[in-house]
């Protein structure tokens, strides 16, 4: 019986410490804890409050959204630049055909002229759709920005009350404003408009 108890105690001592997330080891500390607290597993980092963790997660999510937006804007810009280049090439070819007197044009040249007009028209329509999509995306981003600003404002108010010490509250007469949101220097719509004008390409 004593041998069995000794073996059981030895096996318990050799059990590896439990792991939690990125923390290498989570030790069990039962000294000074009540019965209801013995089953609680916590990370080693206990200096952050739940509100602070939630707020930082919201900021990380916000940064992720900004990066996704920037990628979308760059794609819009690349598509717009390519469309403008294609339209310019077709327009140059069309101008060369138009310069030929009508009586001297062959049947093949007249057919090519009609084809170029149709292609240019389709590309201009495609670019108009691209600008419309960029405008819809801009409005959606504005709505997301408003929702995120409201969320951060609600979360920052109780956090300031909890974390602010009495000494600092007496010294500060004005509350510190919430951290500014990351912004993109210029929206994709504005950059698209800079290339060829508003919704109609100026090369036309």
From Swiss-Prot:
Pfam families: bMERB_dom. One of its GO terms (biological process) is negative regulation of microtubule depolymerization. GO terms for cellular component: microtubule cytoskeleton. InterPro entries: bMERB_dom, C16orf45-like. Residues 3-150 form the bMERB domain. Residues 162-187 are annotated as: Disordered. This is bMERB domain-containing protein 1. It comes from Pongo abelii (Sumatran orangutan).
């Amino acid at each position: 019986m004593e041998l069995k108890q000794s073996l059981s105690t030895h096996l318990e001592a050799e059990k590896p410490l439990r792991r939690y997330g990125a923390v290498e080891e989570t030790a069990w500390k039962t000294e000074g804890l009540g019965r209801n607290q013995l089953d609680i597993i916590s990370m080693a980092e206990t200096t952050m409050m739940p509100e602070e963790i939630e707020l930082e997660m919201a900021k990380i999510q916000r940064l992720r959204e900004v990066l996704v937006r920037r990628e979308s804007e760059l794609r819009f810009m690349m598509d717009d630049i390519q469309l403008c280049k294609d339209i310019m090439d077709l327009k140059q070819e069309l101008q060369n055909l138009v310069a030929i007197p009508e009586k001297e044009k062959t049947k093949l040249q007249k057919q090519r002229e009609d084809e170029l007009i149709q292609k240019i028209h389709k590309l201009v329509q495609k670019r108009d759709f691209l600008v419309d999509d960029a405008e819809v995306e801009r409005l959606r981003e504005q709505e997301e920005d408003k929702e995120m600003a409201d969320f951060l404002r609600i979360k920052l108010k109780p956090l300031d009350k909890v974390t602010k010490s009495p000494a600092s509250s007496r010294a500060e007469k004005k509350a510190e404003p919430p951290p500014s949101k990351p912004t993109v220097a210029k929206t994709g719509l504005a950059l698209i408009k800079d290339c060829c004008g508003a919704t109609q390409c100026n090369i036309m």
